[in-house]
């Protein structure tokens, strides 16, 4: 399957999809590629706990999706840079907002936003809300993304969520666009049985205590150092290969014929031949 640059992630509550979106973006940034993470959940805004408490988010995703006119420059200016990582930017709802904070998002505006966003960065990760049937943007994100990663859990609640939403996804999963994974897998759980309920899974992300601590301390952008995080990191890299065709490159290793290019910093991204807007 041909690789694209836009991935949508959807999953049950507690599956770790937002954590996964962050760690995927961080791994992409190591390759000096620009990535935008769109935290599209209007019910539980996640940008506030992905950034330091003293860092303000000026423009909300809700404002962009309901703007009378939308341009690439407006999207770019609304992006929030991740501290100490110039290759990653965030978009999402602000603290205290919800779906009722803005006028109804139209299909036309959501499509326009996604089309513009696709051309603004090397890679785009769309972290969809678990209640996607109530959010037109999340539904369209899954329709327009090149690949969709469905993340479930190996407990009964996760399986129940999948069964309740499977019908809404039927007819959309064609040509290998949808891939499934089990997240937050804990020792003692039966992932094989759960995988059967999901129709098979391509990835299993284990529970990591260090990840939970980072989540609680709003430090998910920090690297993982514990030994138990190794299998999780391995799965992250496997997803990047499957979805984006991004293979791990050893330090000092370049592709044949590849020439080094000078990076030109243009906040909030480091652009590499992306053109002017």
Segments from the language model and where they lie:
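Inter-motif core of Ras-like GTPase G domains
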Residues: 119, 135-155
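Well-ordered beta-strand positions
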Residues: 123, 147, 200-203
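Beta-strand-loop-alpha "switch" segments that mediate conformational coupling across diverse proteins
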Residues: 184-226
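Conserved beta-strand segments of the P-loop GTPase G domain that flank and frequently precede/overlap
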Residues: 38, 92-93, 125-127, 149-153, ...
């Amino acid at each position: 399957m041909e690789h694209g640059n836009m991935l949508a992630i959807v999953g049950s509550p507690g599956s770790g999809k937002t954590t996964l979106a962050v760690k995927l973006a961080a791994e992409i940034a190591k390759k000096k590629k620009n990535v935008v993470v769109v935290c599209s959940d209007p019910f539980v805004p996640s940008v506030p706990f992905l950034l330091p408490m003293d860092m303000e988010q000026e423009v909300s995703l809700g404002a962009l999706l309901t703007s009378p006119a939308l341009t690439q420059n407006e999207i770019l200016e609304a992006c929030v840079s991740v501290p100490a990582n110039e290759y990653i930017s965030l978009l999402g709802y602000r603290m205290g907002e919800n779906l009722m904070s803005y006028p109804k998002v139209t299909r036309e505006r959501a499509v326009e936003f996604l089309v513009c966003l696709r051309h603004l960065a090397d890679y785009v990760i769309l972290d969809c809300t678990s209640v996607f049937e109530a959010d037109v943007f999340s539904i369209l994100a899954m329709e327009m993304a090149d690949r969709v990663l469905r993340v479930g859990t190996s407990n009964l609640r996760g399986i129940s969520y999948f069964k309740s939403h499977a019908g809404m996804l039927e007819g959309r999963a064609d040509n290998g666009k949808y891939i499934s994974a089990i997240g937050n897998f804990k020792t003692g759980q039966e992932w094989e049985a759960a995988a059967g309920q999901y129709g098979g899974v391509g990835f299993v992300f284990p529970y990591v205590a260090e990840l939970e601590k980072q989540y609680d301390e709003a430090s998910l952008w920090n690297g993982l150092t514990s030994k138990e995080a190794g299998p999780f990191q391995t799965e992250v890299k496997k997803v990047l290969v499957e979805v984006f065709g991004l293979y791990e490159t050893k330090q000092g290793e370049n592709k044949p014929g590849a020439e080094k290019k000078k990076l030109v910093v243009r906040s909030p991204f480091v652009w590499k031949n992306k053109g002017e807007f």
